[in-house]
């Protein structure tokens, strides 16, 4: 009995202990829970509340409309328009092949579109929006909208698409836009501009599109969108409208531009080359031709392999921007500047007559006139008019290469002109220092007299751009006043309705006497009146000045030049520089026809047509552009990536019969792959 009671008491104590432990455990858990609730509801309330709000609200970028580019008369060269696309988020589509099969029943997908889609799909993450089809017609967009509920993860979107209405015309000036690359993204981040490019797929790659990117792009807008638990947008809480990019009005005249392009691109005799025309009074570039050209529209959505190979493998190199990137010996067009150097440095009396037997002998070597011509006693005026190589051969050693370098550079040779395009080359204006740095072999580093003699007629190591020659010609026409050339005349803000004129002020005046300039101008005028270009300019209703030039492509080594016996690519380059009218120059021109032969017979006729067009009496009645926004329409900016209906149907069956369901565009902060071939510098696959 006693043992039984003792055992009962022991069990009771154990029960009490267990109850106490259980109670303490419950209290401990409750304490932990209360503490956690305190932390969440009090201590961390603000931060967690903001995080929850961020999870509920998504920022959707609204891409701004890129600014237009027009010529001086308002001809549209680049513009943006709306384009419908189909895009897919891989993570939201279960069976992609089945989806494509169903989609093809209502919208045609070409084999090329499918190949590109699969290629993009392979390089994207599961949450990225991948382009499936672009350039949908209105009918195709409406058809998909009516069946959109069948295609989960596929959305219809609108985007801004760049268009170049003039095609190949002025392509090297305008340039093109292309998909934002990793390098572009890094550069945007370095400048702190990546936020302004959210939702933007393209960026300026070449030409004006690149050099004025920040003005053309505009400012990205934003929408704060409330997102349902299903991930669908519910409503827009706040909207900041995008600011469209500025419009650019160029100094180019497309009538003149197309006239020159038509000459170079003559189907019967297409030519390679470049031409730049500048107004010497203000630096406005009136024409800028690089032939052959290309269609910038090919690059907007990414150029395909076939077209890329056609352009990049062409022996005519249409992608090269010849006026600023191609460098050439400029031949006799350099002689007027050599003459000015001699006059300024006082190395020869311009009236002194130098014997010209058809060659100049120096150090036991004979340097011959082109064509073996002999001009007899020749002064400076005559030497320019008849283009006596012998006369200028003899000037070279007297001036010296370094002095000639320093003087010529004042006119724009051997340095960047500052034209508002990227990737301009400095070219080669040789000097002793240049040669020392250009060659590793000590024997080749030494400057010899023969080098100076060749340079003095625009040959030898001279390798300059046509833009530099045009700028030097404009500076000479302006009596030594150097004004930086520019392509953009006006920048128009469509929102503020303001305009900004990009006037180039003269940078400096070349240190040369007016009497020396007048002497050279007089000789250049006689070149067109009685000299090497007299036949071309006969009957012109204005007085012009100029200089023809012929630059050797390879050395003849003492043999006679016979064009008919040479491969076309070995023919001499034909050049011309000039300005008109002589008394008050309004246009200065420099041009080259690659492997064209003689400048007087090939290049000068092009200049004559340019002068005739620009100085035609009827052009005197064309008024100068005066900015006005009286007829400007306000352009409402809407999000190309988001359409939110007022009432969201729970499913397609909730709609009335025949009702087209609303489109809920998926919200994707990632950029879309656009092309299977893209290059940053028009150079690499």
Q: Which stretches of residues belong to each language-model region?
A:
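Cytosolic-side transmembrane-helix boundaries in multi-pass membrane proteins
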Residues: 631-632
């Amino acid at each position: 009995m006693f043992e039984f009671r003792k055992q009962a008491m022991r069990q009771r104590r154990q029960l009490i202990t267990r109850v106490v432990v259980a109670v303490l455990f419950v209290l401990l858990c409750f304490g932990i829970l209360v503490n956690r609730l305190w932390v969440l509801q009090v201590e961390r309330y603000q931060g967690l509340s903001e995080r929850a709000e961020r999870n509920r609200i998504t920022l959707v970028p609204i891409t701004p409309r890129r600014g237009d580019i027009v010529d001086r008369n308002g001809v549209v060269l680049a513009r943006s328009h709306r384009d419908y696309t189909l895009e897919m988020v891989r993570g939201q589509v279960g069976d992609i092949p089945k989806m494509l099969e169903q989609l093809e029943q209502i919208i045609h997908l070409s084999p090329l579109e499918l190949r590109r889609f699969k290629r993009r799909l392979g390089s994207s993450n599961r949450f990225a929006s991948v382009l499936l089809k672009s350039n949908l017609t209105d009918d195709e967009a409406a058809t998909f909208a009516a069946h959109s509920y069948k295609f989960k993860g596929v959305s219809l979107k609108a985007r801004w698409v760049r268009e170049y209405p003039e095609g190949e015309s002025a392509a090297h000036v305008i340039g093109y836009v292309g998909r934002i690359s990793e390098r572009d993204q890094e550069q945007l981040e370095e400048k702190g501009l990546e936020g302004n490019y959210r939702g933007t797929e393209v960026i300026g790659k070449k030409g004006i599109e690149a050099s004025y990117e920040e003005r053309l792009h505009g400012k990205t807008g934003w929408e704060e969108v409330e997102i349902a638990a299903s991930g669908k947008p519910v409503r827009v809480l706040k909207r900041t409208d995008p600011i469209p990019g500025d419009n650019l009005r160029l100094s180019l005249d497309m009538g003149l531009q197309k006239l020159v392009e038509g000459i170079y691109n003559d189907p019967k005799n297409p030519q390679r080359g470049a031409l730049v025309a500048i107004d010497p009074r203000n630096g406005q570039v009136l024409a800028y031709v690089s032939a052959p050209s290309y269609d910038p529209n090919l690059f907007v959505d990414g150029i395909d392999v076939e077209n890329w190979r056609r352009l990049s493998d062409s022996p005519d190199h249409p992608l090269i921007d010849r006026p600023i990137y191609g460098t050439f010996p400029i031949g006799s067009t350099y002689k007027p500047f050599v003459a000015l150097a001699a006059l300024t440095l006082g190395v020869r009396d311009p009236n002194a007559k130098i014997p010209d037997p058809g060659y100049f002998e120096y150090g036991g070597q004979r340097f011959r006139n082109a064509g073996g011509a002999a001009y007899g006693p020749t002064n400076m005026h005559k030497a320019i008019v008849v283009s006596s190589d012998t006369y200028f051969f003899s000037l070279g050693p007297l001036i010296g290469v370094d002095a000639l370098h320093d003087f010529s550079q004042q006119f724009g040779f051997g340095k960047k002109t500052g034209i508002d395009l990227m990737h301009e080359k400095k070219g080669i204006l040789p000097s002793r220092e240049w040669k020392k740095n250009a060659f590793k072999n000590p024997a080749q580093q030494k400057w010899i007299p023969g080098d100076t003699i060749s340079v003095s007629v625009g040959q030898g190591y001279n390798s300059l751009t046509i833009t530099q020659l045009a700028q030097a010609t404009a500076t000479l026409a302006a009596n030594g006043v150097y004004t930086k050339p520019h392509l953009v005349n006006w920048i128009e803000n469509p929102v503020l309705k303001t305009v900004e004129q990009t006037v180039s002020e003269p940078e400096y005046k070349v240190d040369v006497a007016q009497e020396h300039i007048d002497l050279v101008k007089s000789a250049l005028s006689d070149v067109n009146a009685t000299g090497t270009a007299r036949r071309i300019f006969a009957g012109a209703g204005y007085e012009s000045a100029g200089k023809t030039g012929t630059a050797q492509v390879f050395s003849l080594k003492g043999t006679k030049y016979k064009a008919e016996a040479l491969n076309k690519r070995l023919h001499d380059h034909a050049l011309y520089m000039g300005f008109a009218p002589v008394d008050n120059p309004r246009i200065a021109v420099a041009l080259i026809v690659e492997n064209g032969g003689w400048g007087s017979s090939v290049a000068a006729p092009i200049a004559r047509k340019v002068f005739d067009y620009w100085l035609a009496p009827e052009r005197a009645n064309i008024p100068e552009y005066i900015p006005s926004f009286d007829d400007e329409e306000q352009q409402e900016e809407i999000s190309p990536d988001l359409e939110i209906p007022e009432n969201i149907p729970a499913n397609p069956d909730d709609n009335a019969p025949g009702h087209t369901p609303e489109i809920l565009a998926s919200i994707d902060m990632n950029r879309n792959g656009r092309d299977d071939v893209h290059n940053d510098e028009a150079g690499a696959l």
